[in-house]
Amino acid sequence: MISVNDFKTGLTISVDNGIWKVIDFQHVKPGKGSAFVRSKLRNLRTGAIQEKTFRAGEKVEQAMIENRRMQYLYADGDNHVFMDNETFNQIELPGDYLKDELNYLKANMEVQVQSYESEVIGVELPKTVELEVTETEPGIKGDTATGATKSATVETGYTLNVPLFVNEGDTLVINTSDGSYISRG
C-alpha cells in the first residue's frame, strides 16, 4: 500500500478493479476543509484517461509492473509477434491492442513489454525511432520560408509533417511519444 501523498508521475496503482498509471497529480489544501489529491490516471488495459480525487493520506495498492526486454519480430495477419530476449519465448499481441505503437514498430526493434500478474498490459517503445521516408513531395528550390513543412510517409505507413529539405530515402529520427520529427538520421 502507498499513500496518495507519495504519488509521482509514472507510478502504477491498482484502484477500482483497474491498473492505472499516474499521468498528473496535484496536492490541494483548501482554506476550509481537509486536503486532497487531484489526479489524472491512464488505464493501462484500455488506455482510457480518468480524473480521480483522493483524500489526503488515503492508501492505495501499488501495482507491480514487470518490464521485459523483447524484440519485435513480425506481423502475422492482425497479430504481432514478440520474442523475449532472455528466454526466447514468443508471444503474440493483437494489432488493436497496440494502437499508436504500430506507427513506429519495425522488425528487430527492441521494446519493453509490460505485464501485471503475467497479463501483458502494454508495450513501451524507445523514446525515438529511426524510420526511412518512403513517400514525400520533392522540396521546391527557393521555398525556404521559416518553419514550412510538408507531409512524409515512413516505412511503417505513418504520415508526419517534416521540413521541406527531407527527401524520399532519408532516414528520420521520430519522437514516439507524440509522433513528431526530430532530425534526419
UniProtKB/Swiss-Prot annotation:
Keywords: Cytoplasm, Elongation factor, Protein biosynthesis. GO terms for molecular function: translation elongation factor activity. SUPFAM superfamilies: Nucleic acid-binding proteins (SSF50249), Translation proteins SH3-like domain (SSF50104). It comes from the Bacteria. It is found in: Cytoplasm. InterPro entries: Elong-fact-P_C, NA-bd_OB-fold, Rib_uL2_dom2, Transl_elong_fac_P/YeiP, Transl_elong_KOW-like, Transl_elong_P/YeiP_cen, Transl_elong_P/YeiP_CS, Transl_elongation_fac_P. One of its GO terms (cellular component) is cytoplasm. GO terms for biological process: peptide biosynthetic process. Pathway: Protein biosynthesis; polypeptide chain elongation. SMART domains: EFP (SM01185), Elong-fact-P_C (SM00841). It holds the Pfam family Elong-fact-P_C. PANTHER family: ELONGATION FACTOR P, ELONGATION FACTOR P (EF-P) FAMILY PROTEIN. Involved in peptide bond synthesis. Stimulates efficient translation and peptide-bond synthesis on native or reconstituted 70S ribosomes in vitro. Probably functions indirectly by altering the affinity of the ribosome for aminoacyl-tRNA, thus increasing their reactivity as acceptors for peptidyl transferase. Belongs to the elongation factor P family. This is Elongation factor P. The lineage of its organism: Bacteria, Bacillati, Bacillota, Bacilli, Bacillales. The gene is efp.
